[in-house]
């Protein structure tokens, strides 16, 4: 026999009970008229009786509402709570809900009150009523598309860069991500393509370097990337994987100056530089599309890179790029576990 799910008395039913009680209708008769069990009405009259033993529909409904509120647990991320203050701090630092959740779990493994799932963080943000605070919180989140579009859907640019070396002859150890010093590169452009920032991402640690450039020409890319790569210790200068953007036309000069071998992806194949593509998505939190990138100094770009490199990454088992890179450079045979 299927058990019928119990339903609470509705306000209109309480109004009828008040009227019938005033008319001295028996409890069983009231239950029959409402299609309810007599025990339901007995419990209702006992719980919500007035001080003089009477019954009022409005006061009964108010008592019911008050009991319901009292039975609800306090929200874990209450706006005035300590945990929300911690979460808000990390959101302001552009951390994602997953990064925040994993960090709290690692920092406070035995304190469930200081742990929160990333779903709860998302729910807390979107539960805010419409207004400036809600917009600020949502702006802290990484903007993700349901479908990634190719970086370029223009004409095939093969043949425009002399002496390209294909990604298909790149050393296999680059794919393994077991050794540092193998980079992926890209150029993100600002408003009207009038400004640019060079991006370098180390494949093993996901560490990012940003380079201020006056424009997207090959001369600017050569000067910017050469200067940044020369600032690294020799073991971190091994290979660079790039798309067939014309800004890399002077790759031979880059290799001669830095010792970094440059390999080129197939046309329209952003997945062959997946680490850099993912990093570009993170960077858009700091450098939104349509921004005039020329207003950022190199010091400001370095601060953005430091912020990204200090964030825990799921793919690094919730270590940060800085932690992974520091560990490997200090003890090449003792690496932090990564996925």
From Swiss-Prot:
GO terms for biological process: DNA integration; DNA transposition. The keyword tRNA-binding does not apply. It holds the Pfam family rve. One of its GO terms (molecular function) is DNA binding. GO terms for cellular component: cytosol. It comes from the Bacteria. Keywords: DNA recombination, DNA-binding, Plasmid, Transposable element, Transposition. InterPro entries: Integrase_cat-core, IS30-like_HTH, RNaseH-like_sf, RNaseH_sf, Transposase-Integrase, Transposase_IS30-like, Transposase_IS30_CS. Disulfide bonds: none annotated. Residues 176-329 form the Integrase catalytic domain. Required for the transposition of the insertion element. PANTHER family: TRANSPOSASE, TRANSPOSASE INSI FOR INSERTION SEQUENCE ELEMENT IS30A-RELATED. Belongs to the transposase IS30 family. This is Transposase for insertion sequence element IS1086. It comes from Cupriavidus metallidurans (strain ATCC 43123 / DSM 2839 / NBRC 102507 / CH34) (Ralstonia metallidurans).
């Amino acid at each position: 026999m299927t058990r019928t799910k119990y339903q609470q008395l509705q306000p209109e039913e309480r109004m009828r009970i008040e009227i019938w009680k005033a008319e001295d209708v028996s409890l069983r008769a009231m239950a029959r008229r409402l299609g309810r069990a007599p025990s339901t009405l007995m419990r209702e009259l006992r719980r919500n009786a007035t001080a003089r033993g009477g019954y009022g529909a409005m006061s009964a409904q108010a008592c019911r509402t008050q009991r319901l509120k009292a039975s609800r647990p306090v929200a874990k991320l209450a706006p005035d709570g300590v945990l929300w203050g911690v979460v808000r701090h990390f959101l302001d630092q552009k951390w994602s809900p997953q990064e925040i959740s994993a960090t709290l779990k690692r920092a406070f493994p035995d304190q469930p009150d200081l742990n929160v799932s990333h779903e709860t963080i998302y729910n807390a943000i979107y539960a805010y009523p419409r207004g400036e605070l809600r917009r600020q919180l949502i702006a802290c989140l990484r903007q993700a598309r349901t479908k990634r579009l190719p970086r370029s859907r223009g004409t095939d640019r093969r043949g425009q860069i002399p002496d390209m070396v294909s990604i298909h002859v790149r050393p296999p150890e680059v794919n393994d991500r077991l050794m540092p010093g193998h980079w992926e590169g890209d150029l993100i452009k600002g408003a009207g393509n009038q400004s640019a920032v060079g991006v370098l991402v180390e494949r093993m640690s996901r560490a990012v370097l940003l380079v201020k450039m006056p424009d997207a020409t090959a001369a600017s890319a050569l000067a910017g990337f050469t200067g940044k790569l020369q600032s690294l210790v020799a073991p971190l200068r091994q290979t660079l994987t790039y798309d067939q953007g014309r800004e890399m036309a002077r790759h031979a000069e880059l290799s001669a100056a830095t010792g970094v071998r440059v390999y080129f992806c197939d046309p329209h194949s952003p997945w062959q530089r997946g680490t850099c593509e993912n990093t570009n998505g993170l960077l858009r939190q700091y450098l939104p599309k349509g921004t005039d990138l020329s207003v950022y100094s190199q010091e400001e770009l370095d601060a953005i890179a430091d912020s990204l490199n200090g964030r825990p990454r799921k793919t690094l088992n919730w270590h940060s790029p800085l932690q992974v890179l520091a560990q490997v450079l200090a003890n090449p045979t003792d690496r932090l576990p990564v996925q």
